[in-house]
Curated annotation (Swiss-Prot):
InterPro entries: Auton_GlycylRad_Cofactor, Form_AcTrfase, Form_AcTrfase_GR_CS, Gly_radical, PFL_dom. SUPFAM superfamilies: PFL-like glycyl radical enzymes. Keywords: Acetylation, Acyltransferase, Carbohydrate metabolism, Cytoplasm, Glucose metabolism, Organic radical, Transferase. Homodimer. Interacts specifically with FocA. It comes from Escherichia coli (strain K12). Induction: By pfl-activating enzyme under anaerobic conditions by generation of an organic free radical. Exposure of activated pfl to oxygen resulted in cleavage at the glycine residue harboring its organic radical with loss of the 25 C-terminal AA. GO terms for molecular function: formate C-acetyltransferase activity. Pathway: Fermentation; pyruvate fermentation; formate from pyruvate: step 1/1. Residues 3-625 form the PFL domain. PANTHER family: FORMATE ACETYLTRANSFERASE, FORMATE ACETYLTRANSFERASE 1. The gene is pflB. The active site is at C419, C420. Several mechanisms have been proposed based on complexes formed with substrate analogs. After activation by the glycine radical, the cysteine radical, Cys-420, can abstract hydrogen atoms from the other active site cysteine, Cys-419, and from coenzyme A, and it can also transfer hydrogen atoms to product radicals. The other active site cysteine can attack the central carbonyl of pyruvate and covalently bind the product acetyl group. Belongs to the glycyl radical enzyme (GRE) family. PFL subfamily. This is Formate acetyltransferase 1.
Amino acid sequence: MSELNEKLATAWEGFTKGDWQNEVNVRDFIQKNYTPYEGDESFLAGATEATTTLWDKVMEGVKLENRTHAPVDFDTAVASTITSHDAGYINKQLEKIVGLQTEAPLKRALIPFGGIKMIEGSCKAYNRELDPMIKKIFTEYRKTHNQGVFDVYTPDILRCRKSGVLTGLPDAYGRGRIIGDYRRVALYGIDYLMKDKLAQFTSLQADLENGVNLEQTIRLREEIAEQHRALGQMKEMAAKYGYDISGPATNAQEAIQWTYFGYLAAVKSQNGAAMSFGRTSTFLDVYIERDLKAGKITEQEAQEMVDHLVMKLRMVRFLRTPEYDELFSGDPIWATESIGGMGLDGRTLVTKNSFRFLNTLYTMGPSPEPNMTILWSEKLPLNFKKFAAKVSIDTSSLQYENDDLMRPDFNNDDYAIACCVSPMIVGKQMQFFGARANLAKTMLYAINGGVDEKLKMQVGPKSEPIKGDVLNYDEVMERMDHFMDWLAKQYITALNIIHYMHDKYSYEASLMALHDRDVIRTMACGIAGLSVAADSLSAIKYAKVKPIRDEDGLAIDFEIEGEYPQFGNNDPRVDDLAVDLVERFMKKIQKLHTYRDAIPTQSVLTITSNVVYGKKTGNTPDGRRAGAPFGPGANPMHGRDQKGAVASLTSVAKLPFAYAKDGISYTFSIVPNALGKDDEVRKTNLAGLMDGYFHHEASIEGGQHLNVNVMNREMLLDAMENPEKYPQLTIRVSGYAVRFNSLTKEQQQDVITRTFTQSM
């Protein structure tokens, strides 16, 4: 114990004392020790020769992936765990931060605990043979999450999956949406964290012996035992790279490396849809500042270490199927890093390291990963606002989320974004990811008595279809409300099953080891097709919509007479309908019982599944044709927001965060000239636009999320025809960024047909 205390004292030398020394409390450490920065980017250094050499090597593999739409390589015989692979390098002599998921760059691992079927599907898609022993083990001896879920699913849920009224459920792959507090590895070292977990384990003994909440207590004891074991395995993994992480980091290089080792353990053992990195830049700046002041490193060396960390995050890959890629296209893993924001005490959390992270988009060029997310506040330093705006204009690689909305909601300044738009407090909260429900199809079920318009089979509860020649708004709304009740029940039932089985068969021990003992859980539901449903209701209410029926009386098309207000133009007649749908569905979800008493939340988010949803949904009363993509996330339907940027932003900002606390995704594309004639004016105008969209006060809620693309449609058309000219072209789509060349032609076309705002 004295040896551990000596390690702690040495590592913490020069830091301001606080509660963080007596308990696991990273926020307190940051608040006591960080240096806010309000200056500009002039201090930044460029790429070193080592960085350029390493990144050129990585880009060879990335270009191959772009060209083939297939993995560079993947395992077929080794089930991945924290310790399953030997050390891997790009070029060991040049790397300042080390660690790969497997023994080779961009080689993907087998992670079978979520489900063997996805692995079999991937092997088949890419003409590789899965080792028969892997299949035998995970079919006959070791049950998977996927098998557990399908053992318990109801016939109703299976029909909902087949029809696409529920899509993307994490029932065949890792759920993700959990952020380990990877900073804890650097600040405390593994031995301290293992000691803390042992104390947590012991704290449950009295409840266990007295039969208090017996099942929950036994489960938590087992989970903590697994967490403790995972921490030990992290030490073993790091030792393969020549590092002893039993004690805390003693300098900036170790702080970055230790933090990354915590994350590497997560992505070696889990293939979650979103494996977010957290909120590390300000934490790491404390170590960098200490070393800079002591003359131990230069600014060039600081940037190089950040570059090599970010390079590793860019290289994380999971083995997926083409069907998965349709929903989440372009290999996203959502290594989301939340940057900036303001502290509860009024100081900015922007540091020089916030700039260094953004600078990687210049030292190594644009990239979709890590999913860099600016926590925007009107009170952010002006220099940082303008630099972030410049980075968006130059790279289209950033997303923005409203710190002035979320910080007071949590009463906490140490939250981060999981996945795309979903906030949670780091190390204290986790999400049960729930994909999304299709509101546009739900409306068609209301009109057709629960019969699916594409499959021509009964999916929803059997009821009389609407019979009249003209759709009546009140009748449609009454029936839709009934079908939303049904859908909410199917949805929550499915998610309860999924997350019970994931905890049982694919528990995220390494991630949860970097959480407190008792965490807050949210049941993160979602809706898709919001603008389609709102516009359809608007058409029914304000125009005349006549259903066209087939020989079986099924409404398969709609004829619209007259004009109707469309979402995205700051028209309260339709905007209020969208607001009502969000609030209405959330209230229905909130009435239902959730697994582990998770707090129900909801997102308005689609990822790239707006294309898949469109394929699965027939003609809708707004005039959208069968198969046409939905507007992504909370976006208006393509081309319908005709009154400029401010009107479109205003419509989306009306959607209530109080009923969508899992996030509201809005993707905004604007041509450069619409922002101004020169770079300085464009930076100022883009920053001003975000100040306006995110402006938040008690009486007027600000928008929650904004993807920003600044580019011309002509460039995207050229990139479709000449992909080799644009190997790193990055664009923002619903909730994340993606290399344009990694999208399918269909998805590229969808992006190109979206609204490119020509005026403010």
